[in-house]
Structure formats: structure tokens, C-alpha cells
Swiss-Prot record:
Protein name: Ribosomal RNA large subunit methyltransferase F
Protein's gene: rlmF
GO CC field: cytoplasm
Primary location class: cytoplasm
UniProt family annotation: Belongs to the methyltransferase superfamily. METTL16/RlmF family.
NCBIfam families attached to this UniProt entry: PRK11727.1
CDD domains the UniProt entry points to: AdoMet_MTases (cd02440)
Organism annotation: Pectobacterium atrosepticum (strain SCRI 1043 / ATCC BAA-672) (Erwinia carotovora subsp. atroseptica)
Amino acid sequence: MTKPAVQKSGLHPRNRHRDRYDFPALKQSYPALIPFVKVNAYGDESVDFANPEAVKTLNQALLQHFYQIEHWTIPDGFLCPPIPGRADYVHHLADLLAEDNRSVVPRDASVLDVGCGANCVYPLIGHREYGWRFTGSEVNPLAMKAANETIEANSGLNRSIRLRRQKNSKAILAGIIHKNDSFDAVMCNPPFHASAEDAREGSQRKLHNLGLDKRSPLNFGGQQDELWCEGGELAFIGQMIKDSVSFGRQCLWFTSLVSRKEHLPEIYRALEAVDAEKVRTIDMAQGQKQSRFVAWSFLDTAARARWLQKR
């Protein structure tokens, strides 16, 4: 008898990953996943999430099965993101845009992904789900090369996803948003940690949570610019807020994930200091994990509605 689907509580209603992974279907769609799928102690099929190659292959299977991404890979040592959580940000962002568009998610929206990474997952999902056009910024040339290889290897993506190199490691939006650009949304998954040591401690916590020895050579993946920056998440978002002032008439919504809820009060103060017209906090959840993104706009309600009507 087929087991009833168990939903991952909290995920967006349109998220294709609300149910537990359907490994029989994934294996059929992507046979390379077969060697990594084992029956766990609960009698369910799963993969070893402590094995980077298994996680990468699972991502390849998910991207092919749900989003028709036939060719996707990342270099060793780069961040391998969980697809369900990344998709949630995209869907909640779609709802935010719909609020100013008579409750209709705009097709062909133009979105800037700050720090798209080697994985380029937000543009891939956003384009496949909603037909959005993406500009991805990236400071790491190797990450940019890998992302571009994915774009070129999949039919039609190079007409809808473009990449721009951020040559100034201290800048976030400056140098990426050009004079004649306009974006319906900016999205960002900022570096979480404040130092390399902080990032190492984070990996040790993951090892502990997985029940593994701290001396295990496990590589969770992630380059310096993906995992940490001076001052961590709060400093990065603070700089993004300052940068956004210069582009307040070129972008409808600026958004950024915020991993630590305790950072919100300082973020709100920073947004008040730059006279943001509208600030929203969108809560998200995946099981026990709580997350959110903060959105701000320098346009009032009427101006935001006119923006989308003129698209």
C-alpha cells in the first residue's frame, strides 16, 4: 500500500516540495540518484545528507524532475543549497509582487539576485515557475563561470538569465544596477557568519546535529564569500540598505533573507534612517526551521501599483 504523503509543515502552498521526497519518482527521472538512496532506520528511502555528493545528486534530480533543468552542477567546495527552502523564498516573493498587482503574480518580472552563487538556484526556479527574467550578480569568478555553464547548457535560459560580475567586493548594488535598469524585485541570501572561525563553528554544530564526530572531514560546502563577511549578516544587510537609497526609483522592492530574528530591530532602524516608504517582514518555515525575509520599497502604495501597471 502506498504511504500517504507527509507534508513538510510551513512551506508555501505553491511549493512543489511540500510533500516528502518521492524517491521512486526521482530515481526514475534521474537514475544517477539510485546509488545514493538507502532505506533508513525508519524504513523510509532517503539519502545521506552528510555526504556532499549525495546532496548534490539529489539537487540534480529535483531540478530535473520539477524544473526541467537537465544540466546542473557546482564545483567542489561551493554551497549546495536545499531546494525546498530556496523555492519558498521565490514563491513568497511572488506573493509580495502580487499584492501590488491586483493579487496576480506578474509574469516576465525582472529580478536581481544578489550573489547568485555557483548554484544559480533562485534564477533557475524563478524563471521556470513564473517566467521571470533574472540578472544574477556574483563576486567570485569561479562561481560565475559555473553558473554561466548551467545557463548555457539548458535550452532557453540564456535568453532569460544574465550574469554580472561584481568587481568591487565592498559594494553590493553599485556597479551591478546600471543607469537604465529597472527591477521589480531584488533578492539576496546574505553571508551568515561574521568570520571564518564563526563559519567553522557553524559547521561543527551541523556535525553535532548529524551525530558525527567533530574530526570528520565532512565538507558542507561554501566559499568565503558565500558563508561569511566582516560583520556578518547584519553588516551585509546594513550596507545593502545604504546602497538601495541610490536605486530607490529603479527597483520596486528590495528584499533580503534574515537568518537571525534578533537582527530585525536594527534592520528596521536602518530602514527608518533611510526613509523607506514601506517595510514588510515575510515569515517562512520548513518544519522546525523558522526563517524570514525583509522587504522594503521607496515607493508608496499608489506608485507601486502604477509601476506594475506600466510593465
